[in-house]
Amino acid sequence: MVTTLERARAAAYPAGEYVGQESFMRAAEIRALARRARVGPGVFVLDLCCGVAGPGRMITAESGCHYLGVDYCASSLATARELAGSLPCRFEQAHLPPLPGGRFEVVLLLETMLAFPDKEALVGEVERVLEPGGRFAFTVEEGRPLTQQERARMPAADTVWPVGLAELTGLLREAGLTVTWRQEHSSSHHAMATALLRCYRADSAQIAGQIGKQATAELITAHQLWSDWLGSGRVRKFAMVAEKR
């Protein structure tokens, strides 16, 4: 059953750009990142913090890769399994890090690096599970740490940890990962944050009927802040690929 929240989210995206993602990425950006990471037939892909795996399911269907999605939320994984149908997707529940055992040619982390305060530990785990020559494909919110005032305004601020681009590149390099591609998405993600904010406000009464008034208010507040920060340059968004030496 499609919820009011999902309908509002889908309405915010340009035609053909919504594939079930819970983020500011458009489908075209997800495809471009997967291509840069050389995701293809038979490639073993680990998708961290996959949620309901909208991007992962699309990538699997279009590329023929072997896909493993990992998330901590059992209900999201149940939805992902149901929607995956006959696709060759597997899903595991885990709190990250550590990462699951095994070796992978590509590790994906879409729109959730922000939630990890210890980027060094995360990058080290990614390096551990990558095959030599493997690729880490991710998006990152680039900027200074939040001030106390910003943390007070942002809902769930304990999951909001921007990082400087130079600092992140250094952490990757120290772990044996070399950045091979980078593209800025600040403008398009500002547009998406603003469009989502507009749709959530328009349907706020119906959304509140499903998730509650407080959760709806926090959803709108968070998107207002992201729209402001991306629009002002307080935070910038990048898609990147780093390869294991």
Regions found by a protein language model. Give the residues of each.
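Class I SAM-dependent methyltransferase SAM/SAH-binding core
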Residues: 44-48, 52-97
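A short glycine-rich, Lys/Arg-flanked "PGG" loop and its adjoining helix->strand segment in the class I
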Residues: 120-135
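Short alpha-helix
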Residues: 161-176
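Short, glycine-/aromatic-enriched active-site segment of Class I SAM-dependent methyltransferases
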Residues: 138-159
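Conserved class I S-adenosyl-L-methionine
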Residues: 1-37, 54-55
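A short acidic, Gly/Pro-enriched loop at the edge of an enzyme's catalytic core
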Residues: 97-107
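A short SAM/SAH-binding and catalytic strip from SAM-dependent methyltransferases
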Residues: 106-118
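Conserved Class I S-adenosyl-L-methionine
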Residues: 183-245
